[in-house]
Amino acid sequence: YPWLRLPQGGYSVPFSSGDGVGAAFQTYAGDLEVNLQYNLLGSTIDDFVPSTGGNPATIELQLSHIFSADMNFEEFNFGFNLAYIPELSYDVLGANPELAPLLLAASGLPPTLRDDVFELLNDDVEVFTWDVYAGWDNGTVFGLVEYSDQNFGESSFSDQKSWYVTGGYRFAQFTFHGTYGQDENEASSNAAERLEQAQLAALATGVRGLQEAQKEDSEFWIFGVRYDFDAAVALKADYTTVMDDDNPQREAEIFAVGLDFVF
């Protein structure tokens, strides 16, 4: 990839990182190259922050089943990824301490609303995520488009749909590139809405905050340059601007410079 920082939405749940076992298969049909891969991975991140924000908190992905297919035909590349995570454990209160009053008040609520609170604070959820991509590269000019969809069980996480399109031009050892993308998040549970409608004064602030945190309708631009001064080392510089229609406080401009090593 040309970027220093990957597009946030499409890569907020990794497809290929973690500890585990895997199997790969490669075959050819004329000019078509087909690569298939299956991984059984587990992963723990101590300071995970969702794309919608929050404090760093521990997240653990247990026994993730990941299947990938990648195909190359002359100058074209296309494929897809499927991931099923039977159990994702997340420290919801660690990431959102403002929700602690919800837990304290739960015992005094009617059973239905109490279940809604526990649904929001559920820290063990099932996840299904997939993406598809297609690219073209003639060695000088390249383009790539990718779409991803992440679906969480009933929890405080947001279901997310993301896409981006990128293009670039290589000149000598330099690569110039630009990317445009959009991320759209919707609450995976409507429990927060039910609690808000119940007009529970003691919980209103926390619930309303969670509702807003789960929503995202953002778009971003990335412009960057890469300089390959060695076959295994590249200097990268990216400028990213993010605009959010639902929450202007998440809007940002980021300039990043770094070295990319390939071992």
Language-model segments: what does each one mean?
Residues 36-42, 80-84, 145-149, 169, ...:
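Transmembrane beta-barrel strands of outer-membrane/channel proteins
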Residues 20-24, 64-68, 129-133, 164-166, ...:
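Membrane-embedded beta-strand positions in outer-membrane beta-barrel channels/transporters
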Residues 1-68, 199:
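Surface-exposed coil loops of outer-membrane beta-barrel proteins
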Residues 38-159:
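Surface-exposed beta-loop-beta
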Residues 175-232, 236-242:
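Outer membrane beta-barrel transmembrane domains
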Residues 25-27, 70-73, 135-138, 169-171, ...:
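Residue-level signature of outer-membrane beta-barrel architecture
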Residues 30-36, 75-79, 140-145, 173-178, ...:
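Repeated loop/turn-to-beta-strand initiation elements of outer-membrane beta-barrel proteins
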Residues 251-263:
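Outer-membrane beta-barrel "beta-signal"
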